[in-house]
Amino acid sequence: MPNTTSASLKLTVQATGENSGTWGQITNTNLLILEQAIGGYDAVALNATTGATLAYTNGALSNGKNKVIKLTGTITANVNVIIPDSVEKTYIIENATSGAFTVTVKTSSGTGPTFAATDKTIKLV
């Protein structure tokens, strides 16, 4: 039976007898992903006109797996930060951007909360 991937954090679930000689590195990566999800922090510089898409890669560290995301950069238009819609996760998002424009945190197929142009606060998403 081959390895599978967990639904929420995209951890590698190793099948019995798989990954001879490499299971330790896979386990270490899984532990680092758990650390990211529980207490991880990343500052994400937004593109001035389009925002950013948070990555959420199977079996790997990814900025979208962090608990706390600080949005930075100077924005020159209303922008979106796209989070994955295939997972259920709570984020703490700090809007530390400059520029008199909005930032909406949403999934690619949905809607989400918007930071107003003057709203430089923290939101739970």
Which residues are covered by each model-predicted region?
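Exposed extracellular interaction/assembly regions and N-terminal maturation sites
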Residues: 2-102
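Extracellular disulfide-bonded cysteine-rich modules/repeats
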Residues: 24-26, 118-125
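Short, aromatic/His-centered strand-loop micro-motif at the edge of beta-sheets
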Residues: 110-116
